[in-house]
């Protein structure tokens, strides 16, 4: 799809922003990635602990969980830290649960063994698509953490069953577009976040009409756009991992 819609960035309707995945961005975490979707920048780390939550004790399997947050000046105006307010927002809780679900969809938790991978996604700069960037970058960080577990002899095979990535799509000025930045996201008629595996399976679809209902044909067009964009992101993951 190459609609002639005029986007603020000048991109085609089916074009991603410039995407970069920088591995080993910090030195302490077992996996760390700086993911950039245009001007959106998120630091994703994967940390391994040799224990599992109480509800999984003695079950012989592992767990993967995620936390998400934004630096106070990640947006146009400063926001108080949620720790200072003493409570996470509903948006934060929703996004971190989404990140955890997305990655668990491509993990064999029994093969991981009785340990937990903690994913932390910290938004350094926000310009739309922070949750989709977080999922895409967190997968690479988790992959690096798993590689260290294998190298240390703690597991004998990778528990990762497939790649997973995510992208936003929406209806902007009446046309379906891929990978919305903030200027588009704040003005779009429909906003959708799509999470898919490398094999093309859907993990999650979150879609909302912003006042104007969308048709089945528009939804199908958005999903087609998302599928193409996610295929590009999965290929980028493979390229940076050397897979």
From Swiss-Prot:
CDD domains named among the record's database cross-references: RNase_PH_bact
According to its UniProt record, this protein's enzyme class is transferase
Task: Spell out the reaction equation it catalyses.
Answer: tRNA(n+1) + phosphate = tRNA(n) + a ribonucleoside 5'-diphosphate
Q: What is its EC number?
A: 2.7.7.56
A Gene Ontology biological process noted in the UniProt record is: rRNA processing
Protein family according to the UniProt entry: Belongs to the RNase PH family.
What is known about its subunit structure?
A: Homohexameric ring arranged as a trimer of dimers.
Q: Protein name, please?
A: Ribonuclease PH
């Amino acid at each position: 799809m190459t609609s002639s819609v005029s986007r603020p960035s000048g991109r085609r309707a089916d074009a991603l922003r410039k995407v970069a995945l920088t591995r080993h961005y910090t030195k302490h975490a077992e996996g760390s990635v700086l993911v950039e979707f245009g001007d959106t920048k998120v630091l994703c780390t994967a940390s391994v602990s040799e224990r599992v939550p109480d509800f999984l004790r003695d079950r012989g399997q592992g767990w993967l969980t995620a936390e998400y947050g934004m630096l106070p000046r990640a947006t146009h105006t400063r926001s108080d830290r949620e720790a200072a307010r003493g409570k996470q927002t509903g948006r934060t809780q929703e996004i971190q649960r989404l990140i955890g679900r997305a990655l668990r969809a491509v993990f064999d938790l029994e093969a991981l063994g009785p340990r937990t991978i903690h994913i932390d996604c910290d938004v350094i700069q926000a310009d739309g698509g922070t949750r989709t960037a977080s999922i895409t970058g967190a997968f690479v960080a988790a992959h690096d953490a798993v590689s260290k577990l294998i190298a240390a002899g703690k597991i004998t095979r990778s528990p990762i069953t497939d790649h997973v990535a995510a992208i936003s799509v929406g209806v902007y000025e009446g046309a379906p577009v891929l990978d919305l930045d903030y200027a588009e996201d704040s003005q779009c008629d429909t906003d959708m976040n799509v999470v898919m595996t490398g094999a093309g399976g859907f993990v999650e679809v979150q879609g909302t009409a912003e006042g104007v209902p969308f048709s089945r044909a528009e939804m199908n067009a958005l999903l087609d756009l998302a599928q193409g964009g996610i295929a590009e992101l999965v290929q980028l993951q493979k390229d940076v991992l050397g897979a």
